[in-house]
Amino acid sequence: MPGRVLAGTSGFSYAAWSPLFYPPGLRSGALLPHYASRLPACELNNTFYARPKEDRIRGWTAAVPEDFRFIVKAQRGASVRALYGDDPAGSIAWLTEFLPTFGQRLGAVLFRVGNEIPRNDERLQELLTAWPHPIPLVLEAQHPSWTADETFAALRAAGAVLCTTDLDDQEETPDIRRTGPFLYLRLRRSTYTDAELDAWARRLVPFLDDGLDAFVLFRHDEDGTSALRAEGFADRVDRVRVTG
C-alpha cells in the first residue's frame, strides 16, 4: 500500500487567511477544527518560542481527528543546549516531557539547527543517543557541513529523519534522503509554480510507493495560498503518479 501524504502548513492561527482558506467571520477557536477538516498535519510554530501548557495541548488534540498529526518544533534555546550544552540529556528531558500529552496525534518533533551551527558528529551522536526513541525525531540542519555521509549514517542508525528543506535562496534543488521511517519535506519558497510542485510530487512518488509516509509542510503566508497548495498536494501526487 502506498504511503500517506501528510500535507500542511507552519501554523494555523491566521485570521488573515479568510476568506481564501477560512470562511469569513470564523471565530478564533474554530480555526483549528476547520484547518483539520481540510489538512492532515500542522507544524506548531509557537512551540519553537515557548513550551505549551498541558491544557492548551489537550485543547489542540480535542479539536482534530484521530488521524491528524502535529509536528512540534523543539524550543530553540533548549535545542541549542541539547546539541552543544554541557547537559544534553537534561535539555532533552525538558524538551520532551510534555510530549506524551499529544498522544497518538504527535507526528514528530522538528529539531532545527540554525545556519550558524556547523556539523559536529560527536554532539549529534550524543543527542541521538539521549533522545527518547519512541518520539519520532526530524533533524533540519541548515549549515552546509551537515550534508555529509556521516550525518546520514548517524540518523539512519538512530531511526531519525533528515528534513529536506527548499528555500528561496537555494541555487540547487535539495536531495531527498531516506534515513528514517518516513519523509519530511519543508517547502519554504515564497511562491511555487504548478510545474515546480509537480516536480516535487514526482520525486516523492517512488518513496510513497515503497510504503513511506511523507510529511509535506508549506510556509505560512499572508492570505492562505500556502494552505490551498497544501490541501491540493495529495491529489497532485496521485495525478503525477498516473501521468508521469
Locate the predicted segments by residue.
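Residues lining hydrophobic/aromatic ligand-binding pockets adjacent to catalytic sites
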Residues: 1-244
